[in-house]
Every structure is written in C-alpha cells, then in structure tokens.
Amino acid sequence: MVTVTQLQPGDVAHVDRYLPLNRLDQQRAEGSTYLVAWDDEQPIAHAHIAWVGTHLGVPEIQDVFVVPERRRRGIAAQLTDAAEQEARARGWDSISLSVSQDGNVAARQLYAKLGYADAGVDPVRVSGSIMLRGRPFEVDDSLLYLVKPL
C-alpha cells in the first residue's frame, strides 16, 4: 500500500538515495513542503509544494516525480491530492502547477482529469543553467500554467 507523508529531516538521507530532491534547499528555508510517496519503507515518488514566490501567487505543485517502474498506477494523482489537501488545510482556495507546453502529454492528461485548467497566462519560457542542490542543471522548456479551485 502506498502512503504519502511530508518529508521529515530524518528521512532526507534515505529518500535522497532513491529520488532526486532537487528543491530540498527551499524546504529547509520553510518556503515549501516535500511530499514523499512510500511503498512500505521504500520511497517511490515525490512532489514539491512551493508556498511563496510562485508565478500565480497561489501554492504551486512542482517537481512531481514517480520512479519509472511505478508510473501509471495512480501515484502522481495521490501526490497531487495530498498537495491539494495540504493547501486547503493552510486556508488556500486554489492551487497551481506547470507542465511542459510541448511535452509530457501523459502529465497534461492526468492534470486535466484531476480538474486543472489553463490559468489564462502566457506560457513561461525557461532556459539556461540553474543551480539545483549545488549542481548546474540545464533547462530549455516552455511551461504552461494550470490552476484548480479547491
């Protein structure tokens, strides 16, 4: 059975061996929350919720990642639901996320099924080198922002 919990400081080393915790520094600064999906003691997926500094000014689900062998089993939907519940618990009435405008058709289909709609803003082009956990990472993509009322 898969369960979703907030990433706790004591779990970081264990989870980091299996999943790319790209935005861990933001959680440490208390501007975000990592959710981790577990199958028994094994971390199999995560999602990041940014609470401040987001493009639409509402919480933003970012960096949803499910290990390849566990995809298409509802785990991303479970993580998204947990993020929505956390946003509701904090008093928010909507939540957002972004997805590649030209790629990741499966993710766009999932988010539409879960009730996310185009936020009505122009896609945002991201390109260049950014630092993630002390390492450079090259990005080149256009992001489509989606939003869902809670």
Where are these regions (language model features)?
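Conserved acetyl-CoA-binding loop-helix of GNAT-fold acetyltransferases
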Residues: 66, 72-85, 89, 108-113
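Terminal substrate-recognition subdomain of acyl/acetyltransferases
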Residues: 124-150
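Conserved acetyl-CoA-binding loop of GNAT-fold acetyltransferases
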Residues: 111-121
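A short, internal acetyl-CoA/4′-phosphopantetheine-binding micro-motif in the GNAT/acyltransferase core
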Residues: 64-71, 99-101
